[in-house]
């Protein structure tokens, strides 16, 4: 196992004269008359560690195995580097080849590969410079999320992956069953493993509300699933969601937390992953640093849905999707508001109840609910949330109204019970982890920020 002080990122910061061991995978080998220069990386740093291997240290048949992709370990001394880009390099005393990579067949040779090509190499793309940077940012973002909530006293809650309820009421769910669905007989789900219809979860929100009614401030961070046949750069069938739920919290408190949360995530990643962000800015998005600084330093604009529709209708723009009160905003509308009207993130609140979920608290006007969407330049919606309906009678009526859309009152008996026994105003939101990663990395396709993308027709690896 590589020890913390032996990672490449640590070795690059150490002083000349130290005796060290480095392990990792060969990026390149360059040969001179009496010396070999090896670029070594173990995934911990966007910068490779140079290994200087004098002729004769190992037999030539071993040198021949030191090709791109090979796994090696090196013992030697750190010396001041004469090359550009690093302060130190290893003067090798011994080298071991643990695993070879035949250059005739290893697909990640020293050249720029398209993202499409790398998606086909999900078992190897993690070794590329691009995905090394992306997945280090992914790791940092996960750490930032836990730190933000733990520093504020939130409890981390594990919610079920298999559920009998639809938190979104949208019906786009993966069914879980042990029954033989090819049987000519109609499926009897009372005889199924769980004795009822069950699905992969679309959200942990409803279960998180249970914990919010006992521990006040909680959050979930786990996988969610949507059986939407959307083959776009913004959609996945399996992705991760962060969902805080807070008791004694209204819509304004929810907006305040969401803004602080986003700024905190960006600040953490900028501080933790500077070289990775510089690499991604160089190759994929020259405006990345400017974009991230803009979010950190902006005061988010807050407008109602009605005000947003008015701005869109008065814009004089010919949108692909016409705007009218009662219709959901599309990506083009979100980007217009954030990039052209306000030039910063925007929180839109108080949406028509007919386009939002059943659990959102009804406003006094009877037409809108206390919902919010946080929109960011370049990507659109990045957070969706609401104050939850805490009034038992109002929630029950709303569930009954939604029966035509597949909501079954009996499936939500426990959710209604929360309002009967010590209910309180509460709120929460959800953030798509991969959507945030797209924003942080400048990647344009969501398949490039998750290790193993699950999309229609694709479940490889």
From Swiss-Prot:
Its EC number is 6.1.1.22. GO terms for biological process: asparaginyl-tRNA aminoacylation. Homodimer. Belongs to the class-II aminoacyl-tRNA synthetase family. Keywords: Aminoacyl-tRNA synthetase, ATP-binding, Cytoplasm, Ligase, Nucleotide-binding, Protein biosynthesis. It holds the Pfam family tRNA_anti-codon. GO terms for molecular function: asparagine-tRNA ligase activity; ATP binding; nucleic acid binding. The keyword Protein biosynthesis applies. It catalyses: tRNA(Asn) + L-asparagine + ATP = L-asparaginyl-tRNA(Asn) + AMP + diphosphate + H(+). GO terms for cellular component: cytoplasm. The lineage of its organism: Bacteria, Pseudomonadati, Acidobacteriota, Terriglobia, Bryobacterales. It is found in: Cytoplasm. This is Asparagine--tRNA ligase.
């Amino acid at each position: 196992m590589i020890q913390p002080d032996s990672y490449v990122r640590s070795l690059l910061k150490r002083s000349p004269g130290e005796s060290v061991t480095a392990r990792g995978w060969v990026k390149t080998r360059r040969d001179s008359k009496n010396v070999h220069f090896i670029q070594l990386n173990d995934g911990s740093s966007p910068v490779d560690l140079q290994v200087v291997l004098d002729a004769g240290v190992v037999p030539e048949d071993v040198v021949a195995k030191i090709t791109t992709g090979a796994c090696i370990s090196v013992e030697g001394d750190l010396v001041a580097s004469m090359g550009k880009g690093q302060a130190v390099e290893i003067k090798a005393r011994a080298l071991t080849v643990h695993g070879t990579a035949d250059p005739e067949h290893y697909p990640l040779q020293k050249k720029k590969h398209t993202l499409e090509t790398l998606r086909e190499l999900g078992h190897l793309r993690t070794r590329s410079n691009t995905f090394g940077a992306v997945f280090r940012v992914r790791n940092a973002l996960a750490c930032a999320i836990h730190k933000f909530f733990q520093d504020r006293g939130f409890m981390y809650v594990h919610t079920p992956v298999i559920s009998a309820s639809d938190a979104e009421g949208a019906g786009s769910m993966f069914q879980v069953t042990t029954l033989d669905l090819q049987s000519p007989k109609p499926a009897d789900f009372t005889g199924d493993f769980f004795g009822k219809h069950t699905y992969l979860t679309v959200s942990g929100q409803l279960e998180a509300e249970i914990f919010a009614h006992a521990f006040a401030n909680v959050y979930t961070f786990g996988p969610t699933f949507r059986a939407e046949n959307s083959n776009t750069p913004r959609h996945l069938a399996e992705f991760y969601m962060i969902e805080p739920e807070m008791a004694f919290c209204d819509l304004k408190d929810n907006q305040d937390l969401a803004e602080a949360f986003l700024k905190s995530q960006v600040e953490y990643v900028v501080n933790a992953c500077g070289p990775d962000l510089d690499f991604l800015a160089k190759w994929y998005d020259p405006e990345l640093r400017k974009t991230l600084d803009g979010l950190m330093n902006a005061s988010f604009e807050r407008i109602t849905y009605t005000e947003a529709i008015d701005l869109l209708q008065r814009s004089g723009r010919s949108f692909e999707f016409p705007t009218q009160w009662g219709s959901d905003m599309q990506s083009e509308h979100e980007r217009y508001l954030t990039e052209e009207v306000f030039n910063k993130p925007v929180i839109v609140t108080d949406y028509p109840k007919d386009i939002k979920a059943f659990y959102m608290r009804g406003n006094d006007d009877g037409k809108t609910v206390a919902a919010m969407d946080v929109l960011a330049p370049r990507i659109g919606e990045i957070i969706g949330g609401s104050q939850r309906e805490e009034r038992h009678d109002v929630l029950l009526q709303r569930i009954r109204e939604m029966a035509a859309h597949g909501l079954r009152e009996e499936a939500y008996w426990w959710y209604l019970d929360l309002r009967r026994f010590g209910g309180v105003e509460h709120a929460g939101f959800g953030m798509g982890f991969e959507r945030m990663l797209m924003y942080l990395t400048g990647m344009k396709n969501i398949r490039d920020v998750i290790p193993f993308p699950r999309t229609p027709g694709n479940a490889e690896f």
